[in-house]
C-alpha cells in the first residue's frame, strides 16, 4: 500500500517535532495548552512534562471503523502498545489519506491484525464535567514489520526514561528554568515540567517505569508482540469516545 511512502515524506520545518511516547503517558494527561494565536501550536502536557503537539506512536491495530457524517467520511481506530491504547482518527477533510486507511480497514475487517506506526497531531475532547480525553488526528501512517516496531519500542523507552530522569531531578529543584537546568533537566523539557508540576502535583512514577520495562521486554522478544485483546462494545445510545472525538474534529472542539 502507499503507507510506506506516506510516513517517509519530508516533514515541513514549520511543524513541531514528533515526540515518541507510550499510550499510558498520553492517556493520563489532562492538561491542554492552547496556542495564543491562530497559527501558534497547541499542546497536551503529560505528567512527565512532555509537550505533545505531534507524536510518533506505534502498536497493534486494535480497532478500525468508518463513519459517514454530513461533512463526509471519517475513520477512527485504536493502536495498542505495551502500556495501553491510543485513539486516532482520519478526518473528512483529509481525503489524501482515505485510500490508504480504506485499504487498512479492508484488511482489518478480514481479520488481519498488524503493527502500525502513526504520526499524529494531539487532540483533546473536554466533557461537560471537565474531563479531558486525548487522541490523535493522523497525519502519516504505515504498516511495519517486527524489526521496525522493535526500534520504535527501544526509542520510545529511551525517550520515556529521559523524561522520568528529568522529572526526578525536578523534584529536588525550585520550579524556575535556571534552577531546573542547574539540576540537570534538559533545556527542551524545562517548560513542560514547570507546567506539569504546577498542574499534576506529586504522583508515583512507578507505572511509567513498568511501562518502559514492558516495552523493552517485547523488544527483546520476551513477550508476544500481537495478542488478542478485543475492544469492548459500546452499550446503549450514549456516544462512544471515538464518536465524541470525531464530532469534535468536525465541529471544532480540540487543539
Label each PLM-derived region with a short phrase:
Residues 1-51, 211-220, 238, 242-246, ...:
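OB/S1-fold single-stranded nucleic-acid-binding modules
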Residues 41, 94-105:
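Short acidic (Asp/Glu) patches
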Residues 52-71:
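Structural detector for short beta-strands of small beta-barrel domains
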Residues 58-60, 78-80, 119-121:
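Residue-level recognition of well-ordered beta-strand positions that form the cores
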Residues 64-69, 121-127:
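Short beta-strand micro-motifs enriched in acidic
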Residues 66-98, 136-147:
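OB-fold (S1/OB) nucleic-acid-binding surfaces
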Residues 100-121, 127-243, 252-255:
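Extended, charge-rich, solvent-exposed interface segments
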